């Protein structure tokens, strides 16, 4: 049975979950598929081409959370939904945020961004304000998810835990802000509040 491009991408994502991005190689992927490494070049020009496709697939398959905004919903509802969906797409795979940061945008991504820019400009944002808002939001989602995944990948047993005994306020604040979902939602709200303020 002939190997399809999609089969290679799926195997790549499975291997990513097993070994992480740093240890993902075309040689290991070929072994996983039971083929010789040069065969992969029939489907992808190079490793970067494969990583781009893996990232695009992970994002395309991201769970929409069952709460897709209704047509005509306000711009901030759409941006919040988009941010959460991107985060879920990255969290669905080990090193998903690292994969996203190492990949180039898929061609259809530009059409998606164009639609968001149109929506934001209709809401009253300038072209520059709309683009900066999208960039800030995207960088926030990528950065917080990257930190969340890297923290999860660290060997907590070997890590030296700080002693906050002498700093009770810091200790309480760290514990109170520990939940990654609540932390993400707080930052998301701050960004959207800042964008709303630009329209006032």
Feature map (PLM): residue ranges:
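Amphipathic alpha-helical packing segments from all-alpha helical-bundle domains
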Residues: 81-82, 100-136, 142, 156-166
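Actinobacteria-biased recognition of intrinsically disordered, low-complexity terminal regions
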Residues: 1-6, 27, 200
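Short, basic, alpha-helical segments at the C-terminal edge of helix-turn-helix-like DNA-binding modules
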Residues: 57-61
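Hydrophobic alpha-helical connector segments
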Residues: 64-110, 134
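Helix-turn-helix
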Residues: 7, 11, 15-53
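C-terminal peripheral helix-coil segments that are non-catalytic and often amphipathic
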Residues: 122, 150-200
